Swiss-Prot record:
Cited InterPro entries: Ribosomal_uL15 (IPR030878), Ribosomal_uL15/eL18 (IPR021131), Ribosomal_uL15/eL18_sf (IPR036227), Ribosomal_uL15_bac-type (IPR005749), Ribosomal_uL15_CS (IPR001196)
Function text: Binds to the 23S rRNA.
Organism placement in taxonomy: Bacteria, Pseudomonadati, Thermodesulfobacteriota, Desulfuromonadia, Geobacterales
Protein name, per record: Large ribosomal subunit protein uL15
Species of provenance: Geotalea daltonii (strain DSM 22248 / JCM 15807 / FRC-32) (Geobacter daltonii)
Keyword Nucleotide-binding: no
Gene name in the database record: rplO
Subunit-level organization: Part of the 50S ribosomal subunit.
Superkingdom classification of source: Bacteria
Region annotation Disordered: where it falls in the sequence: 1-64
């Protein structure tokens, strides 16, 4: 094999469309823009959400509610998921990430009480629900807020 004989796989590369270069090219004269109208002009594009003068959808629908910018979003982990760890082990943020329980830590990790925990673990997280805290301590585990 030589460098001058290497070719890309079939269908891997496409020729770019050259427009406005004569009728023989198949894309001459109107350059694939059709005849007249706003979209045929230079800079002629309809702005996003424009519906031809009709009242646009985003103005027809009522305003509703409020989303606070300061609201914290926690990644949720249930007790049933934590039951996969070994007896007496320390479950912290790194351990949860390594085991694939948590992908993105938004503003922290919150432990919820869904499912059963059968092993005593030391769990370190940013938040705990009251029920989760009770279940962990009842099994003999410890809760540490980071």
């Amino acid at each position: 094999m030589e460098l001058n004989s290497i070719k890309p796989a079939a269908g891997a590369s496409k020729n770019r469309k050259r427009i406005g270069r004569g009728t023989g090219s198949g894309h001459g004269k109107t350059a694939t823009k059709g005849h007249k109208g706003q979209k045929a002009r230079s800079g002629g594009s309809v702005k996003a959400g424009f519906e031809g003068g009709q009242m646009p959808m985003h103005r027809r629908l009522p305003k509703r509610g409020f989303k606070p910018l300061s609201k914290k979003v926690y990644s949720v982990v249930n007790l049933s998921q934590l039951d996969a760890f070994e007896q007496g082990s320390c479950v912290d943020v790194e351990a949860m990430q390594k085991s694939g329980l948590v992908k993105d830590i938004c503003d922290g990790i919150k432990i919820l009480a869904s499912g059963e925990l059968t092993k005593s673990l030391t769990i370190k997280a940013h938040k705990f629900s009251a029920a989760a805290r009770d279940k962990i301590t009842s099994v003999g585990g410890t809760v540490e807020e980071i």
